[in-house]
Amino acid sequence: MGKLDLDWGLVKEARESAKKIAADAQVFIDAHSTVTVERTICRLLGIDGVDEFGVPLPNVIVDFIKDNGNISLGVAKYIGNAMIETKLQPQEIAEKVAKKELDITKMQWHDDFDIQLALKDITHSTVERIKANRKAREDYLEQFGGDKKGPYIYVIVATGNIYEDVTQAVAAARQGADVVAVIRTTGQSLLDFVPFGATTEGFGGTMATQENFRIMRKALDDVGVELGRYIRLCNYCSGLCMPEIAAMGALERLDMMLNDALYGILFRDINMKRTLVDQFFSRIINGFAGVIINTGEDNYLTTADAIEEAHTVLASQFINEQFALVAGLPEEQMGLGHAFEMEPGTENGFLLELAQAQMAREIFPKAPLKYMPPTKFMTGNIFKGHIQDALFNIVTITTGQKVHLLGMLTEAIHTPFMSDRALSIENARYIFNNLKDFGNDIEFKKGGIMNTRAQEVLKKAAELLKTIETMGIFKTIEKGVFGGVRRPIDGGKGLAGVFEKDNTYFNPFIPLMLGGDR
């Protein structure tokens, strides 16, 4: 029984609208692919490394086909055909193309059935590797006596140097962190390639590379065994390489991925057609790999008012839920985002925050909701900041938020020191323990401030979803409904990388992962 007396008929209507919005966009998504989707297929076929100029081989292959062949047939068809012709593996084919020793666009075409058969061993071996990673995660959790009950304490490291990040991450795990997110270097989401190898320089974060993923995964596994807890690793697959980074994460057993097309469109000016197509394949991969995705609704409240625009967050959560379901990603892996971002001077602001968080929990009961700390109104006064974080911590434990992005008392001053993290973890653990069953023991007053507020937000969200259903997601974004940010349908970065699929196009991984045995 919910605390908020929500109108469940209205919730159902909102879900139906969101379902239609996603289905409408899916028509476009199903008819198109992008250069990064094709590069992801290359990576999943075992193509890795760089050419003599440092260009990733997946980029070399896809660019070669784009310039010399017909990309609308899809990269899998070219690679499979070349495997039959040359008797070589995809990696060897890519290396020869890079050295200009092979032209895969000028070969005699074989039958589609034979091409798919040629790819079968390698596609199945990749899928088995991802399944083994998923099992390894489950085995660790079992070894440590099951998953953590209550919120995951989620912290961020961002030094630019992966080896320094390891030092910070291991310290955070020992201090009590459950999830470590390695922030990406500034602007990586705008690169149309994924850098290669271990990196030691970054700005505001560290490069997301497969080798960096491997280094951090090993460090967290080692400290996890020492502590008897499974420490989750999180990275970011928004931006122009969404599905590629999802694939790298699946291959290296990451546990969480920031993954939201709307975030990329609004806050990174990535073309909407491009990133919605990319999001679909990235979510199929994340769903199959057992990765929890985190969505970016919290960011709307950094550019728009958290009280007036709360309904846009809920509407976006409904839409993100439907986009995830279409990609085969279960509710248990949907870290739908929201945030504690109301102006601290607001009268009864805490009640409004509590109502919003409780509403998300009741409407998405199985989702490991991602709850963001106050950032917009942190002033650099560390004492007040610590109290703002304490109120945020109270909302999390009271309403059962799951992915708890730890607030930092030094927010708005500098990137956290290890000591800042220790104090913030101590604050959260104190509150989570002291108020452990508080949420179960209280009821909300009928007709009170919180009940009224939640019903109001739900009503506005349902109305907004009805409007979006009529307009479609593309027009809605053009009008600036989310976060007050307008983006044109043919503007932004990456549109040149979108293409319509030929009717013989195939992506061998979609049937294996979307309909596949988990």
UniProtKB/Swiss-Prot annotation:
Catalyzes the migration of the L-beta-lysine and D-lysine epsilon amino group to the delta carbon to produce 3,5-diaminohexanoate and 2,5-diaminohexanoate, respectively. Keywords: Cobalamin, Cobalt, Isomerase, Pyridoxal phosphate. Belongs to the KamD family. The lineage of its organism: Bacteria, Fusobacteriati, Fusobacteriota, Fusobacteriia, Fusobacteriales. Pathway: Amino-acid degradation; L-lysine degradation via acetate pathway. Its EC number is 5.4.3.3. The keyword Isomerase applies. One of its GO terms (biological process) is L-lysine catabolic process to acetate. This is Lysine 5,6-aminomutase alpha subunit. GO terms for molecular function: cobalamin binding; D-lysine 5,6-aminomutase activity. Pyridoxal 5'-phosphate binds at R184, T185, T186, G187, Q188, S189, S238, Y263, R268, N299. Heterotetramer of 2 alpha and 2 beta subunits. InterPro entries: Cbl-dep_enz_cat, Lys-AminoMut_A, Lys-AminoMut_asu_sf. It comes from the Bacteria. It catalyses: (3S)-3,6-diaminohexanoate = (3S,5S)-3,5-diaminohexanoate; D-lysine = (2R,5S)-2,5-diaminohexanoate. Its cofactor is adenosylcob(III)alamin; pyridoxal 5'-phosphate.
